[in-house]
Every structure is written in structure tokens, then in C-alpha cells.
Amino acid sequence: MTTESRSAPATDAIVPADAIVPDGKDWTWVLERPCPDCCLDAASFPATEVSGLVLRVASAWLAVLADRPDDEVRRRPAPDRWSTLEYACHVRDVFRLFDERLRLMLTEDAPRYPNWDQDATAVEDHYAEQDPAQVVADLAAGAARIAARFATVSGAQWGRTGFRSDGAQFTVDTFARYFVHDPVHHIWDVTGERMPTRRSGADAV
């Protein structure tokens, strides 16, 4: 998956982006059992509610960035863990990437997604040097875009398929639930708090 959870002892040091150790884990296991960290149960979360959850988690991200000064969001808590800004850049790019993958799944038969190296992108695009205000704007726009596209899905479209570059197969249903774990999990990464993922009146996750 695109998700990474980089835990390490806290430090005030600001270190080069290439200190991050690439994450080679396959995060498709989140479709089988609840995440022990962020507690999202993607296996049982309704795909039809992903659109709304995307907007709520985007609001949580905007609040995190708005509440912290620029020097704080740029500071890594440890050499091998992204800063809040770097995580936000990653989430913004996940919204963009998965929106394009969703478009492919809805318009083409069994597409294979182009590969994406999240760690290489973080270095090449200089996540740590980006403008937090622009990241906020782009993250909000990306969330609105993919939420709107998920909101159009209905009926048999949930069963349409697509393939990751490593051959892993998704339906639009499993793709939606796999995807939404990423921004939810990264809220936990940067705040240590687990956000409610069900709407008011529904059972909390």
C-alpha cells in the first residue's frame, strides 16, 4: 500500500529526506482485519461511505496543518519518520493518484495501474521544502475531486476491476476501502489520535 507508519524515538533534528527507509510492506492486509494503529476496520467499512469519509479526513488534515506553525510542520520527529508536512504532501498525492486509478477502473476494462514509488516521489518533489499553504489547498482540492468521483459509483460499477503493477487485483469496492485507510492512518501517524470514521448516528470505528 501507499501507507507507511514510521515510528521512532522523538528528536528535534531536521534531516535530509533520503534518510527515510523505503517501505516494502504490502498493506492489502487492511482489507482482512482492523488496523491495530489507527483502528480503521476497512474490511467492514462500507465502500459507499468512503466519499464522505474522504471529506472528513481531509478536514482533519487541514485542521492539523492550520494549528501548527510552519517550522513545526517541517520538523521530523525522528530521522526515519516523515514530518507532518511530508505526510500531508504524501496524502495530497495519494488523493491525486487514486483518483486517476479510480477513473481508469470506471472507464477501462481491468486496467493495470502505472507503478508509483512514494519514497522516490517524496525526495524528487522535495516534500520537506514545499509551501504548507499550497499543500493545504491542493490536499483539499484533491480530496473533493476523489470524493466526488466515488460518489458517482453505483450498482455494478463497484465490481469493476483493476490491477496494481505487482499484479494485486482490486474491485472498485475493495479499492475504495484500501485507499481510504491511507489518509486515516496518517492522521494517527502525525497526531497519535484515532479519528472517528463513521458518520454521527452510525457505529463508530
Question: What residue spans do the PLM features occupy?
Answer:
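Secretory/endomembrane lumenal or extracellular ectodomains immediately following the signal peptide
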Residues: 23, 28-44, 53
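Short, contiguous alpha-helical
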Residues: 2-32, 72-122, 144, 159-205
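Aromatic-acidic/polar surface patches that form glycan- and anion
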Residues: 50, 54, 80, 139, ...
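Acidic/histidine-rich alpha-helical segments that form the ligand environment
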Residues: 53-66, 121-160
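A short small-residue
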Residues: 35-41, 119-127
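Active-site rim elements
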Residues: 44-48, 131-136, 176
